[in-house]
Amino acid sequence: MKKIFAIVTLLVSLLVAVSTGFTATASAAGQQYPSFVDGAALVQPVDKTKLLSKLREIESKHGIRCAVLTVKTTQGMNIRDYAQSVQDQYFANAPKGSILMVISMDNRKWHITTDKTMRTKIIDDVVTGDLKDAFINDLKKGRYAAAFTNYGNKVDELMTYYEKEGEAYDPSKKFSFGAGAVAAIISFLIGGGVK
């Protein structure tokens, strides 16, 4: 019972802390829930402005929420659960879906979460593959503004693909010309040997 009480208390404090941070930032930005909240102070002010503008442009273009949140700590919460909680509380209201990247500096972890609608447009394999690959090197090197910009650019690219093709980008459906050539050679060899 004490563990359950501790977990509930932790979740309530987490939501109050995040809510307070969003409210303060939202008032300054004139937006209800900002697309970029740098609670861990990782990005220079000039880069914050550019990044916020970029994320808003992506959101406007595609009718989605595309956000980045940095925090000093998740207050002991698993990064995935923390990201999902923030997603559900602040970004799950976009009719065409939402995607959120959360970075916690206390344990140097990050997580990208999508809502149900967005999962039909950017599949989980792409989030952990192509999307991650777009920003991970800059993130590891501490080039946070570049990492977040690359994240936004890749989300924009994936959403453009979805809007053009009518389906989510799926790397497993790409045709491999190398595999096709090998298959052609093998079938030629087998076909030539059978008479």
Show the residue positions of the predicted features.
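Intrinsically disordered, low-complexity segments enriched in polar/charged small residues
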Residues: 7-8, 15, 97
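Positively charged n-region of N-terminal signal peptides that target proteins for export
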Residues: 1-11
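Folded, non-transmembrane soluble domains that reside on the lumenal/extracytoplasmic side of membranes
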Residues: 23-184, 188
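C-terminal segment of classical bacterial N-terminal signal peptides
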Residues: 14-25
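Alpha-helical transmembrane segments
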Residues: 188-195
